[in-house]
Amino acid sequence: MLTVLYLPIARKTFNTDVADTLRQETEELLQETVELISPMELMTSPDDLDAFLQDVSSPPDAIVYQSLTFADGEFIQAAVDRYSIPVIVWSVREPEVGGRLQLNSLTGGNSTSHVLRSNSHPYSFLFGNPDEAAVQERLGSLFRVMDTVKQVKSLNIGVIGEHPPGFYFSGTDTGELHDVFGAKVTTVDLYDAFARAKDVPEERWLPEVETAEKQVLTLNRDDATVQRFAQFTSAMREYIAEENLSALAIRCWPDFFNELGAAACSTLSHLTEESMVSACESDIHGALSMFILNRLSAGRAPYLGDMVHVNEENNALVFWHCGAGAYSLAREATGAQPGVHPNRKLGFTMEFGLKAGEVTLFRVGHTPEGYRLLVFKGEALDVPQRFNGTTVEIGLKQPVHSVMQELMEEGFEPHYALVHADVTKEIREIGRLFNLPVVEIEA
């Protein structure tokens, strides 16, 4: 759970009775959703605030700085001098219009935002009273974002084998990745993983088959590639536990087919279904993109695919991959079906079209200028799979050729992550908190 430091700020020259009522309502709201650190009273001077902060023993993950009345920049400066964590600046409404300005909270929030911007300190802004549904919804959204940021900063991505030759977009500068996101990479030799997988005994790999059988229709447990899938998945679980991994980027071809005699797609699908997001072709930023979508959507399974086809009739883009896709992403009409790799003819892979619904497409991208984020929305259409493997056809509101052209001119990497949820607002906040540009395509 997110640990939040609540700072209710007010000056005694304003209406502190109204301010304190709003403070109490806010505390009740926050206690329902986060682990709260609160002074339980208004902070009306920098000395009060400093004394309280000195007594805070547990490290918070975020600050809710509520400008209950106007207050100068000393208050927030004292907080950011002590903490580098994200801040939610919260201004409340005036209790009534006419006569004396009782709170001047909005100016307080404006002043606070200026101080934070001048300090290059990550923050978001919230306006309204704690009893408003829209405020509660946005606050919950911001907490999801900040919890995701917290998890990204401690993320350890397991990279199992180097990316294929020429797949430059799959790699990363590990130092820059850590400097920007806090995430780190742990490398595992793919052939060591193969050797470990082959030694996994049946009593350890059989439960993986039993789990897959519940979600993959007509899966043949006697197929040798099903056993190979289960053995490699079991080996991955060992590495995940040993190295404390939270995401995977796995080199799949040609090594899996040549050395293991099976496709990697099923392991990627199986683990992603369990929120251990796994990207093929050792795409490190693809794994990071999937991880962020999974956390922002409260654990929904993300997908990673290439943009491969334009369907003008449906004004849609088709995304595809060889055979990876979490089981729960399959259309209800077909369910998740086992198959063989379309090029190598080895199993087992996933064969299905993705289910319908609103989706957010997202990518953590990189250029010579540094990191950037891509986001746009679409509608996954209820259509059969378009090619062997897994596919999703994304209907757009804007002309499909215009969207495709813009994506090409922006030059984003050819792996796009998506999730069945609208998290575009959250992606914008992710960009703000990591101080990254967000390229939002009007699609």
UniProtKB/Swiss-Prot annotation:
Species lineage: Bacteria, Bacillati, Bacillota, Bacilli, Bacillales
EC class name: isomerase
Magnesium among keywords: no
Keyword Glycoprotein: no
A biological process from GO: fucose metabolic process
Biological source species: Alkalicoccus urumqiensis (Bacillus urumqiensis)
Gene Ontology MF terms: L-fucose isomerase activity
Family statement drawn from the similarity comment of this UniProt entry: Belongs to the SqvD family.
Pfam families, alphabetized: Fucose_iso_C (PF02952)
Gene expressing this chain: sqvD
Protein name: Sulfoquinovose isomerase
